[in-house]
């Protein structure tokens, strides 16, 4: 029970840190941002490969965007407001490669977060993940765009 409370506290802190974020990064104009933390090291998860897909009319997943997390465990600039229209989005984090690079054999191959974007009008999405080799937790911060 105590470990669950600690995990929830960490995730809440992650969202607050993400919202506060460094100034001057342009994140307020970014409609989709990913933030990843390493729960083992207690630090940002650097160089995690992220792939974003959009569900097509034929129910297949079309590649939409990709990148790697920064030294802050963040990935900005995946898309623009013009391109990020309503639809089903899948964000995939390559956790296996991340852990293998640290010499750790993980349980999960990757983390997937699937959600309906912009179904209630334009929004900003921050997908946050807290990783360990045998578990992960995700949360999302959805907000109205700031002009």
UniProtKB/Swiss-Prot annotation:
Family annotation (SMART domains): TR_THY
Sites of 4-carboxyglutamate modification: 62
Location(s), subcellular: Secreted
Gene3D superfamilies reported for this sequence: Transthyretin/hydroxyisourate hydrolase domain
Residues reported in the UniProt entry to bind L-thyroxine: 35, 74, 137
Example GO BP: purine nucleobase metabolic process
GO molecular function: hormone activity; thyroid hormone binding
SUPFAM superfamilies reported in the protein's UniProt record: Transthyretin (synonym: prealbumin) (SSF49472)
Signal peptide (residue range): 1-20
Principal location: secreted
InterPro entries: Thyroxine_BS (IPR023418), Transthyretin/HIU_hydrolase (IPR000895), Transthyretin/HIU_hydrolase_d (IPR023416), Transthyretin/HIU_hydrolase_sf (IPR036817), Transthyretin_CS (IPR023419)
Post-translational modification note: Sulfonation of the reactive cysteine Cys-30 enhances the stability of the native conformation of TTR, avoiding misassembly of the protein leading to amyloid formation.
Main function: Thyroid hormone-binding protein. Probably transports thyroxine from the bloodstream to the brain.
Family: Belongs to the transthyretin family.
Assembly notes: Homotetramer. Dimer of dimers. In the homotetramer, subunits assemble around a central channel that can accommodate two ligand molecules. Interacts with RBP4.
Record's protein name: Transthyretin
